[in-house]
Amino acid sequence: MNAVVIAVAVMLLLALLRVHVVIALFIGALAGGLIAGMGIEATMLAFQSGLGDGAKIALSYALLGAFAMAVAASGLPKILADTLIRRLDADAEHASAKVVKVTSYLLIAGILAMSIMSQNIIPVHIAFIPLLIPPLLTVMNRLQLDRRLIACVLTFGLVTTYMTLPVGFGKIFLEDILLSNIERAGLDTEGINIVQVMGIPAMGMVLGLLVAIFVSYRKPRQYEDRPIMGGTVAEPTPTRYNLIMSLVAIVATFAIQLIVQFSGSEADGLLLGSLVGLGIFLISGVVEWNKADDVFTSGMRMMALIGFVMISAQGFAAVINESNHVEPLVAAVQQFFGYNQAMAALAMLIVGLIVTMGIGSSFSTLPIIAAIYVPLCVSLDFSAMATIALIGTAGALGDAGSPASDSTLGSTAGLAADGQHDHMRDTVIPTFIHYNIPLTGAGWIAAMVL
């Protein structure tokens, strides 16, 4: 009985039974270690040693959560939302078919741009969704925009950006987690252009988005005008000064990331940029000193769960590596597939989809599958670029369609603010169909051609 298979199966089963993911990862690692004959002490030591590998990533998430709340406190999201509402309201008054169509596409483009920027230029991740989307629901109702389409647009911007561009959250996914864990598993990635490698799988996401916009959800859908559930949240009053200082903080945060990244420094530009951005918000008075603790704590709390899951996943991966059961599993899989790379690649992508669906986070999936897939890809003679594409795609698969992923939960949090959007039917299923199917195909093609 292979300890790696048992560990992953136990973890997935518990996660699907809605046991907390952190607990599921810990119990799965414990089961794998015991099956491997490591004993309680050796298993715990391996798990504990792996926890440190996720600490920097978790800290990055916490600081970005604080930065997101600081941006929200400045009133910048409210300005963006109010500007969109005014312009769209003005257009909606002249409701000719052509104006409605143009306005709808402008709204879609605006939401897509914001979701892309939330991963790098304004690194707030999903925090912008409950701030920006609920005020726009009334306008969407007038335009009869299908909210399933908006869920697909939001998910595309969140997932495709971090899996392709190594800036902001993309740096965490591509460099701090993907390349770092692949190198830790023994594969040399020196000189590989990660954007070129992940660009092919990203084309699958683009295809899914185009199908969602122009085929699946192009027809009007009726919604009622209902009040936002829970009433309106007290929002800051935006001022010109706050707007200017917010833009300064955002530009500084983004610029520092780029400078550190392209200077060849090994320092973490995301951590440094976030700290500088937070400092600007504090020193400028946009975030008042007596409220800073509450603002930053609420932001860190928002990202804390994701951080803990990432730390636990690194511990799980460490137990997998120490079990000495990866090599027998690789040998068994190689014997089953022979040297049929096409079938092996498809199987690895499907397994990655299942694991991500169970955990709910592609960021947390990568350390686990990298420990298993790197030796497997080497044994099947996949190139280093093909291996990276396979593991990166296998990790991203499922994030778009997992009921527990932050991408789908964030989309639903905004779109269901008036009670007319179902999480499973209107977010999970549409994003799963439109992204996981073409992403699987594009990832398979990347593995075959790279």
Regions found by a protein language model. Give the residues of each.
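Hydrophobic transmembrane alpha-helices of multi-pass small-molecule transporters
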Residues: 1-63, 199-318, 434-438, 442-450
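Structural signature of hydrophobic alpha-helical transmembrane segments
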Residues: 1-4, 55, 126-128, 203, ...
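Hydrophobic transmembrane alpha-helices of multi-pass, membrane-embedded glycosylation machinery
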Residues: 9-10, 26-33, 131-136, 156, ...
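Membrane-helix interface "capping/anchor" motifs
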Residues: 13-24, 140-149, 284-291, 354-365
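Membrane-embedded alpha-helical segments and adjacent helix-loop junctions characteristic
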Residues: 40-141, 290-378
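Alpha-helical transmembrane segments of multi-pass membrane proteins
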Residues: 95-118, 143-160, 186-197, 341-355, ...
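Membrane-core helix-loop-helix motifs of multi-pass transport proteins
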Residues: 137-237, 408-450
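Helix-coil boundary and interhelical linker segments in multi-pass alpha-helical membrane proteins
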Residues: 374-386, 449-450
